[in-house]
Swiss-Prot record:
Coiled coil regions in record: none
Name of this protein: Vacuolar membrane-associated protein iml1
UniProt entry tagged with the keyword Ion transport: no
A Pfam family per the record: DEPDC5_CTD
Species, as recorded: Neurospora crassa (strain ATCC 24698 / 74-OR23-1A / CBS 708.71 / DSM 1257 / FGSC 987)
Family listed: Belongs to the IML1 family.
Annotated region described as Disordered, given as residue ranges: 1-64, 107-139, 513-534, 742-783, 1042-1061, 1374-1401, 1441-1482, 1684-1732, 1754-1775, 1977-2004
Length: 2004
């Protein structure tokens, strides 16, 4: 793979790439000089595309003449066309060619100056001067295109046109009509200029990385790209090219080749800004302006950032969190075991300094606010600043009372008064914890996928200079969380940049920490370390059996649970540069205010030296010297041992001395090696032995050093090169990714700097493991070769190189994130094993060489895995064994490396290799063949505790000896993601970019420009690049990774493929899926090196038509996982998964680490402590299963796949007739909404994905195509329906499969619409379902029961099946209308006499509708109706214990909507059927529960227009059981689907639904109360009722076939009524509400909600009712954040509509908002005012609006404007003074929350509300009236003369309406009901206070109103009086929800349609009486609307029933 990081130097001779026709050989442009840049030597490609151009004389084009351009002004698909008849055959169609605009002045300049050029441009006359201006560079452009001949018709039309160029190309590249251009073929003489990086921006869409890859391949690859180019992919994905780079230089255009790296930046992302409120935030800026630090943030940086955003018009979502760590001074020493320190109140205890306990605080100031509202953001920030410090400093005074161990309040207060709280300094703050919590926000971004935003960016603003002291564990956790996702972290530092490398994490080396459990839980195990937070019991470098002897601080304390004296602190510090954090410094001076410092000292361009004037003295050198922070005290003097001629041999020892401990506790360890410098390395300065001879007869040390001094006085003329250039690249491969198993701290001792340990000496690579370069004299290397070879033969062919000092500070090696464990005082080799068996065998052979293992042998045997020691070997024990104790034989220590105690060998080994290991410590400069070990042990004679403080200054920790362990040491585990450095003296040429930037490397076109960072990353975050160059070394790869292979082949029967996928297509899908999961393709030569090959056959992922052959591979990596996809066996793909081994210490760390911060969310009134599991393991994915899914072996989306998912609901809106052009006259709101769902269902059915194997079959039976959705509509909630109607529900498993028994007649006997007998048709229709008839049954709608009716959609399906000449449902509907009784028939007699021509077969139950294919109820006309079987109406008289089944009930009917089981009452406390009902369905065979599935799933094609290159199929889940008053649920699941196509489909659904009064809203999949588990910075807001509801509740009635009252209401009746009052709609029911005897599930899983969840009609607010009756409120950010919503909000603001106010819901008066219909946002309101409609009336607080919708009243005719007639107190208001409330287009969730909360806190309002609900109880049914009816008195008022409303009661009649006795009711008797607008809205778009406002001409409508919704006592008394005055006539009410338990007394209004309606009502009443009913029948209703009509009349026991 070619390099992705071009070198500035000339690579010399390179092999040309194997490209046909040389079409893609590129040369660098010569627009300006290319600066040198640091690069990874590994990444220089062997087929680099950068090369010198030949001289112009050698490449003169054959096209010497110039051609004339003609610009195509019209739309053109082809950007350039050539007339090949004129140009000739030298231009071959399909080849690449360059077109250059000819400029004579450029030619003259070029000819005069072309000899200055190192590289030449396209043609000899186009040579630009090297110093030309930018304008000239802009004008000098070339366009490369694929040659295509002009069509014949164009040639005929324009015969003289030579070059035909599209207008947009001509404009960009400076071509005009008649311009002269030259054409040049792209070949090896004239290669294309390949862009190194192309930057694209996009917004308002979610673009997965798979989409980015395909966009680059299909729209950019092998094309010219130019700045400003608009890219459109699949007709919907849009992006714009914002910059083109050639090797770091911006150019106007270049060629997108195979080595070009696309950078995708999102302008609609999510930003989380963390502001660290450390102590310094309140300090003054002493170095700069002198202002307070926080002011620099809110007055400097943030305004500048927000203004940048505004100028770029980006659409980000911003969350801002303030965080701080508060330290507590308890007033007494923690060492004394103060129980308060063990207090669970604290988050932890500081690991250094004063060891104070601390508490972490987080304050959410802004939560997901649009970036355009930045003024509000800054205001909230400034306001919070005033209180933040006070709140966190006093929090403990309240919070610690509950944690106090004392029961005496006085003692508690005294203890609290002693504690002082203070914010910690930034360096000790909770920096990593904040980042870790931020990453948890997006750990599950595949759930509730936001389809409008791409990218996540976390910005941390800190007063720190860029260095943080962190715990290793926190660093490990954060790194693990970040390396696998696409989150970028930017650090903005407020102070000036320091002089050391940044960003820097300072952490204690975990190898020295011996505390076995987590810091604030370590109450039992003794600690051997002063690091309270380290959980790995690893062994310290100077630990004895008794404890630790490493340096400690005087202020160190012992954590609670530790015993004092258990050990002294091991202050061993490492300094790490993370690859996932990028730092900037706010200077506040200019647009260049963010000076990017990052790793400036490490990789800055050394050639650009700064002038002396730039240097500012900013530190006190003396202090640095005293603290040993500098590299050396003698700044200019190099350490002696770095000189190649220094006599290192003199500094060697021969034996292994025996250590001993004196009575003072000092450990005396005899030198293994004589000190190699002139002063003692032992910090006690107690003993100095310079005269020890390494061997007998050798010169004394003094003599050798004297000779050296003399030789140095005679300076040689030639010095050996310490860094031979030929080996630099070899170093990089070995060190760059292995960065040292060994490493040192901020190591400053010059004794560490030996030539062989410097980076320049490292020549070992994965495939040159036997070579070492030695800077010493040649003979020294040769002299040692034999010994090494002997050792190597026993041990391993590979040797791990010694890593240079600066790399030791940050270990990237095999032991990961912490420094490799210190080892015994023995000469130990660090060997990387290539073969596990050989390494283990050889190590054990060495170990068993002697009877007692030497320390060296023990050290060799030591590994990162569980440790095994030979018996008798003294070991360091992390559990504090006594001195001299021996470990048991073969003792295992799980988790951490151990270090054998350096003891004197009991026998001298005779084996040379063993002697080499145990006998002496050789300088690595003398013997480069192996690596030195712990230097301090080698040099020390004794270590005194008081001197130990200095030990960390010159630690040098050697690498571990891997034995291919099953686990990795902590240092190795995270090595690729950190770079250890000495921050004060990093080697500027040693840090490799590929390692330093790792997966983000290819985002930086200019990696050398590190001093200044533009605003780009803060304004438009980049997605994780598609490619990376990082790959482990061969040794790492073989020793640290497990391999899991499997093969995948395409399933030939894959139903989701049009035809079987080719292997290339399957490979592309597998790559796409991995891109979506965060993988990157590994490019560059590192892969080949890791496999020990010079070259690998690697697939080119950016090739458009590349065909993968057998043997080709592609490597993809993410985190610690590498996938190799290889083509094998012709059709198969072999997958090798390489997974890094787990961390060795995992068992010893507290894996369930609970982090306990105090968080205050946006709406909280105070801080609340909560525990978070920071180590929640992410389960490994089963990639075999995933790839099997891609290959088509299974198509079910299971949780193993981690598929993307989103949930949507359709919320019923209050509709206006002006917005329903598609509906027919007379539809109610409810009917319109059901029609909208039917339209959506038709759309889904039309575009459902049909497998290719079924298409021919589907085409042949198109007319047989039944509606697969088969949605069952009920007017009760699902739990109620399941409890009451279980046995007849078609959703019951077992009923669905055979619910249609096929056609009644064979094809020969089918009817024909041209000629059929009406009587025969009627007979066939009324056959039992099993005989082919249509399902006839009693059907309830709201309060009305319709007998023996069928549904329009069922009839449509039946007609299609039984008529041979019907082709589709439209024709069937047309035929059904011919069979209808016409509307002009006035009576059934007329129908009987007048309809003999094929009509008059059936009629709408209310005669309101013609025949429709939908949820409409029809009955067979009396002429053709079969007589009802005996006992048809007897079902309510059947004993309740035996559910009865009417004759019409057939189990395989598609619509069994009436249950014959006993009536039930729903109560959420218990099962709805508990104690009273045992459904017959529960008696299934085998005792299994009956199973009901409430939703279905279908495969839906989101690309029905076939724009994509692949099938785009999602799983669409939809409700099967729906109550039109509730939300309709839709859920989408997908894998490997273009998200933008899904978004387009959803927007189309939203537009369609909005036309029918439905709002499509995205809602969270999980319920609101669980939000904190996903997002720790959000918490539901709890609203408590000021007055608890009374225990007395109304009675709930429910029975599907009768009105027998039941005695138990639903739970939380008042709370549900309250939410509905505030316009909330039921979303999801809790799992507990379903009967326990029924197995209820959805197509996506089991119901799992704990509480009942509602959603506001605006879609912006979610509410839940808890078990205690409290209300939880949560903003629905998924919906309110949509960009469409923001656009509409802007439109509304421009329109000037008022926001809120006016009524108690914040809905102010004013004009209705104008909104675009169907927009997919919270403002997508279906209501639009016109000239005739008044503003939409919204229910006020007096009424329960949603549950009391007048679903029977549709937008029939416009009436005069009116108001609701009631105020917020429930009292009637004067119409002249009432302002009509308007439902605004936008309702902020905060406004709704405030209104709801204010009402809930108002005791008087709540009591009045409860009273209104209970007043129904005060009016029991009057004995002298129809049972179940309360006396109702309704005042009469004058109505309009033309009112034609038909009522079922005399005093509610009007016009020509008659009662059952035939009396005419005069218009003047029509009373004024004063009904709420929730009932009377949408009749002409008006609210009505007077029935005269209803203009219902010639149609029967039903109006049912529950008194629960009527808030006026006066209305109730009036209704009672009216009822008492006419006891003989029944009134009928719409039923309320059963769960609400609405009482039985109802006001019923039946509006009939003329005299016939009254007659029908009378007939129904008579029929009911004849059937034995105690009272008359139901008020007539439409199937959808519940309106009254032809079947109305008296209501006996029915009248009191409640219905929803």
């Amino acid at each position: 793979m070619a390099s992705r990081n071009f070198s500035s130097g000339v690579p010399g001779h390179v092999r040309p790439p194997n490209w046909s026709s040389h079409l893609r050989q590129f040369s660098r442009n010569s627009l300006e000089r290319i600066p040198d840049m640091p690069r990874s030597p590994d990444t220089v490609s062997s087929n680099s595309t950068i090369r010198d151009r030949p001289s112009s004389s050698s490449r003169r084009s054959r096209f010497e003449r110039r051609w004339t351009v003609t610009v195509n002004e019209s739309f053109a698909r082809d950007e350039v066309l050539l007339n090949l008849d004129l140009i000739g055959d030298e231009a071959t169609p399909g080849s690449l060619m360059a077109i250059d605009v000819f400029r004579p002045d450029a030619e003259k300049q070029a000819q005069g100056s072309h000899h200055h050029h190192h590289h030449h441009h396209h043609h000899h006359h186009k040579q630009p001067p090297p110093d030309r201006t930018k304008e000239a560079a802009e004008s000098q452009q070339r366009y490369i295109f694929v040659v295509k001949d002009m069509p014949k018709e164009l040639k005929a039309r324009y015969p003289s046109v030579e070059v035909y160029v599209a207008k947009h190309i001509a404009d960009v590249f400076g071509m005009r009509k008649g311009s002269q251009v030259t054409l040049t073929p792209i070949d090896h003489h004239n290669p294309a200029i390949e862009a190194s990086h192309v930057e694209l921006c996009f917004r308002d869409q979610y673009m997965s990385r798979s989409d980015m890859w395909q966009l680059a391949v299909r729209e950019l690859s092998e094309k010219t790209v130019y700045k400003g180019q608009m890219v459109l992919f699949m007709g919907t994905l849009k992006a714009q090219v914002t910059a083109v780079y050639v090797e770091g230089r911006k150019v106007p255009s270049a060629f997108f080749g195979h080595n070009t790296k696309p950078i995708f930046r999102s302008e609609s992302a999510r930003y989380v800004l963390f502001i660290q409120m450390a102590r310094e935030m309140w300090d003054f800026d002493s170095d700069g302006s002198g202002e307070i630090m926080f002011n620099k943030v809110v007055n400097g940086f943030l305004p500048a950032l927000f203004k940048k955003w505004a100028s770029l018009k980006v659409r980000h979502l911003v969350s801002i969190v303030l965080f701080a760590r508060v330290e507590y001074d308890t007033g007494i020493s923690t060492e004394l075991g103060n129980p308060d320190v063990q207090n669970d109140y604290y988050t932890g205890v500081q690991s250094s300094g004063d060891r104070r306990p601390y508490k972490d605080f987080y304050r959410v100031v802004v939560s997901e606010m649009g970036s355009g509202e930045w003024t509000k953001i800054l205001y909230q920030l400034k306001r919070e600043f005033n209180y933040f410090r006070r709140d966190i400093s006093t929090f403990h005074q309240k919070a610690m009372h509950s944690f106090s161990s004392s029961d005496d309040p006085a003692d508690q207060q005294a203890a609290l008064n002693r504690i002082t709280a203070e914010a910690s300094r930034a360096i000790y703050g909770n920096f990593l914890e904040a980042i870790n919590m931020a990453t948890s926000l997006f750990a599950h971004d595949y759930i509730d996928r936001d389809l409008m935003r791409t990218g996540i960016s976390v910005v941390v603003i800190s007063p720190s200079p860029g260095i943080f002291e962190v715990e290793y564990d926190a660093l490990r956790r954060t790194t693990e969380a970040l390396v696998g996702n696409g989150i970028g972290i930017d650090l903005i530092c407020i102070p000036k940049a320091p002089l050391h490398s940044v960003p820097l994490f300072r952490y204690r080396n975990p190898e020295y920490s011996t505390e076995p459990t987590h810091h604030h839980k370590a109450k039992t195990a003794p600690s051997l370390s002063s690091t309270p937070k380290q959980t790995a019991p690893t062994i310290g470098s100077f630990n004895s059996m008794a404890g630790s002897y490493s340096p400690s601080r005087g202020t160190d304390i012992t954590l609670h649970g530790d015993y004092a004296g258990s050990g002294l602190a091991q202050d061993e510090w490492n300094y790490a540069l993370p690859q996932w954090l990028h730092v900037s410094y706010w200077t506040g001076e200019s647009e260049e205010a963010l000076s990017y410092h990052g790793i400036a000292l490490s990789v800055s361009d050394v050639s650009k030296t700064r002038s002396g004037d730039d240097f500012l003295i900013r530190c006190r050198m003396y202090d640095l010297q005293m603290r040993s922070v500098m590299e050396t005290n003698e700044i200019e003097t190099k350490p002696l041992h770095l000189d190649p001629y220094f006599p290192h041999k003199a500094l060697q020892a021969n034996n292994v001395p025996k250590p001993f401990i004196d009575q003072d506790g000092n450990v005396f360890i005899q030198n293994l090696r004589i000190p190699e410098t002139l002063f003692d390395h032992v910090y006690g300065f107690q003993k100095f032995a310079p005269d020890k001879h390494a061997k007998l007869g050798e010169k004394s040390l003094w003599k050798q050093l004297q000779d050296y001094d003399d030789s140095r006085a005679r300076q040689p003329s030639f010095r050996h090169t310490l860094a031979p250039p030929s080996h630099i690249r070899e170093y990089d491969d070995s060190v760059r990714r292995h960065h040292a198993d060994d490493a040192s701290l901020l190591g400053t001792s010059y004794t560490e700097r030996r030539p062989s340990t410097s980076a320049s000496q490292m020549t070992m690579t994965g495939h040159r493991s036997s070579q070492r370069f030695n800077a010493d004299k040649p003979e020294s290397r040769n002299r040692k070769t034999v010994d090494f070879d002997k050792l190597n033969s026993k041990r391993s062919p590979t040797i791990t190189p010694k890593v240079p000092k600066f790399m030791k500070q940050i270990s990237l090696g095999s032991s990961g994130f912490r420094i490799a464990a210190p080892k015994a005082a023995t000469a130990e080799l660090s060997i990387e094993s290539v073969n596990a068996d050989r390494s283990l065998a050889s190590s054990r052979a060495l170990m068993n060489a002697g009877t007692v293992a030497t320390p060296a042998k023990a050290a060799i045997n030591r590994s990162m895995s569980p440790q095994m020691f030979a018996s008798g070997t003294p070991v360091f024990s992390p559990w504090g064994a006594t001195p001299g104790s021996f470990a048991p034989s073969h003792q295992y220590f799980e988790g951490t490396p151990s270090r054998p105690m350096p003891i004197k060998s009991q026998q001298i080994p005779t084996d040379p290799a063993a002697n080499m290991l145990s006998g002496s410590m050789l300088a690595s400069t003398l013997r480069a063949d192996y690596v030195p070990d712990n230097r301090d042990l080698f040099y020390s004679d004794a270590i005194r505790a008081e001197d130990a403080k200095k030990v960390y200054n010159n630690k040098l920790l050697a690498g571990a000896v891997p034995e291919l362990p099953s686990t990795l040491s902590p240092t190795t585990a995270l090595s690729p993601w950190l770079t250890l450095v000495n921050p004060s003296n990093p080697d500027s040429n040693k840090v490799d970019i590929a390692t330093l930037y790792s997966r983000w490397q290819h985002v930086f076109p200019r990696p050398n420009e590190t001093r200044v960072m533009k605003w780009k990353s803060l304004c438009s975050p980049a997605a994780v690049p598609l490619t990376t160059e990082y790959f482990p070394t061969k040794a790492q790869f073989e020793s640290e990774y497990h391999r899991q292979p499997y093969n995948v082949s395409q399933n030939a029967d894959d139903e989701l493929a049009e035809e079987p996928k080719s292997r290339d297509e399957m490979l592309r899908e597998m790559i796409s899926l991995r891109f979506c999961q965060g993988f990157q393709v590994v490019v560059g030569p590192a892969v080949a090196k890791a496999f020990g090959q010079k070259q690998l056959k690697v697939t080119d992922i950016f090739s458009r038509d590349h065909t993968a052959e057998d043997g080709t591979s592609i490597f993809m990596s993410v985190g610690n996982t590498i996938h190799q996809l290889s083509c094998v066996n012709g059709t198969e793909i072999e997958v090798n998964i390489f997974v890094r081994k787990p961390i060795a210490s995992a068992g010893l760390y507290n894996d369930r680490y609970l982090y306990k911060p105090a968080i205050r969310t946006l709406l909280d009134h105070g801080y609340k402590t909560r525990s978070y599991d920071m180590v929640a393991p992410t389960p490994d994915r089963n990639w075999n299963y995933v790839d099997a899914f891609v290959a088509g072996h299974n198509d079910e989306l299971s949780e193993h796949l981690r598929f993307w998912r989103a949930r949507f609901v359709l919320i019923p809106m209050t509709a206006r007739h002006s917005f329903f052009p598609k509906t027919q006259y007379g539809d109610s709101e409810e009917e319109i909404r059901i029609e909208g769902i039917r339209k959506l269902a038709q759309m889904w059915q039309k575009h459902r994905y049909i497998p290719a194997s079924e298409r021919s079959f589907q085409a042949s039976r198109r007319k047989k195509d039944m509606n697969p959705l088969d949605i069952v509509y009920k007017t009760e909630d699902p739990s109620v329906v399941i409890a009451a109607e279980l046995e007849t529900l078609p959703l019951l498993e077992g009923l669905e499969g055979g619910h249609r028994k096929g056609q009644l007649v064979t094809s020969r006997e089918q009817f024909s619409k041209k000629n059929f007998s009406l009587a025969a048709l009627a007979e066939a229709i009324q056959q039992p379902v099993e005989n082919g008839g249509i399902r006839m049954q009693n059907r309830r709608w709201h309060l009305r029961l319709h007998y023996n009716c069928f549904i329009g959609s069922d009839m449509t399906t039946w007609l299609l099946e039984n008529f041979e000449d019907l082709e589709d449902r439209e024709e069937a509907e047309e035929l059904g209308n011919r069979l209808m009784v016409t509307s002009d028939d006035k009576s059934k007699d007329e129908s009987k006499d007048g309809r003999k021509d094929g009509g008059g077969l059936f009629v709408h139950v209310e005669r309101r509708h013609p025949f429709r294919d939908g949820q409409y109820f029809y009955q067979i006309s009396s002429d053709y109706a079969k007589p009802n079987p005996p006992g048809w109406f007897n079902t309510r008289r059947v004993p309740v214990s035996v559910p009865s089944t009417p004759h019409s009930e057939v189990r395989d009917s598609p619509r069994s909507n009436v249950s014959m089981s006993r009536p039930t009452s729903i109560h959420e406390d218990s099962s709805p059927t508990s104690g009273t009902v045992t459904p017959t369905a529960a008696m299934m065979a085998g005792g299994k529960k009956p199973r009901v599935v409430l939703s279905k799933v279908m495969k839906y094609d989101v690309d029905h227009r076939k724009r994509s290159y692949r099938p785009e199929v999602v799983d669409l889940h939809y409700d099967r059981l729906h109550n039109p008053d509730n939300c309709y649920h839709i859920r989408i699941d997908w894998m490997n689907v273009t998200a933008k196509l899904i978004e387009d489909a959803i927007e189309a659904w939203a537009r369609e639904a909005a036309l029918y009064g439905l709002r499509l809203v995205e809602v969270p999949i999980n319920e609101a109360c669980d939000i904190t588990e996903i997002n720790p910075f959000r918490r539901p807001y709890m609203i408590k009722l000021a007055v608890q509801p009374p225990n007395q509740q109304p009675i709930t009635y429910f029975d599907p076939n009768s009105f027998t009252p039941q005695a138990q209401p639903g739970r939380h009746f008042y709370q549900r009524a309250l939410l509905r009052k505030f316009d909330f709609v039921l979303d999801m029911e809790p799992a507990s509400s379903f009967p326990y005897t029924v197995d209820v599930s959805y197509s996506w899983g089991k119901p799992d909600f704990k509480y009942t969840q509602f959603i506001h009609r605006s879609g912006t607010l979610i509410a839940e009712i808890t078990d205690e009756g409290d209300i939880l409120i949560l903003a629905n950010r998924l919906y309110s954040n949509r960009t469409a919503a923001q656009r509409e909000k802007e439109m509304q603001q421009k329109g000037g509509g008022s926001g809120a106010g006016g009524d108690n819901l914040g809905l102010g008066p004013g004009p209705g908002r104008i909104s675009t219909p169907g927009l997919y946002g919270p403002n997508a309101h279906p209501d639009q005012p016109n000239a005739v409609s008044s503003p939409l009336v919204k229910p006020t607080t007096a009424f329960l609006s949603p549950a009391l919708r007048p679903h029977l009243i549709g937008p029939l005719a416009s009436g005069p404007p009116s108001t609701n007639g009631f105020g917020t107190t429930g009292q009637p208001l004067n119409r002249s003074t009432v302002t009509v409330p308007v439902t605004p287009v936008i309702q902020d969730p905060e406004v709704i929350k405030d209104e709801l909360e204010s009402f809930c806190r108002d005791r008087s309002a709540l009591e009045a509300f409860y009273r209104e609900l209970l007043e129904r109880e005060a009016h029991p049914p009057a004995p002298n009236t129809t049972p179940g009816l309360a006396p109702v008195k309704i005042p009469s008022t004058t109505a309009t003369k033309d009112s034609t409303l038909a009522f079922a009661t005399p005093h509610l009649g009007a016009g020509q309406n008659t009662t059952s006795t035939g009396h005419t009711v005069p218009d003047t008797n029509i009373p004024s009901l004063g009904l709420p607008p929730g009932v009377l809205a949408a009749i002409g778009g008006t609210g009505l206070s007077n029935l005269s406002d209803l203009q219902l001409v010639g149609s029967g409508t039903g109006l049912g109103i529950s008194p629960v919704r009527v808030g006026s006592p006066s209305l109730l008394s009036a209704a009672s009086a009216a009822s008492a005055g006419h006891p003989s006539h029944s009134t009928m009410m719409r039923r309320a929800s059963v769960q609400e338990g609405v009482m039985g007394s109802r006001i019923g209004l039946g509006f009939g349609g003329g005299a016939s309606a009254a007659a029908a009502a009378a007939q129904a009443a008579a029929a009911a009486a004849a059937a034995g009913a105690s009272g008359a029948g139901a008020a007539g209703s439409s199937s959808d609307a519940g309106g009254a009509g032809n079947i109305g009349g008296g209501a006996g026991g029915d009248a009191g029933a409640s219905e929803h």
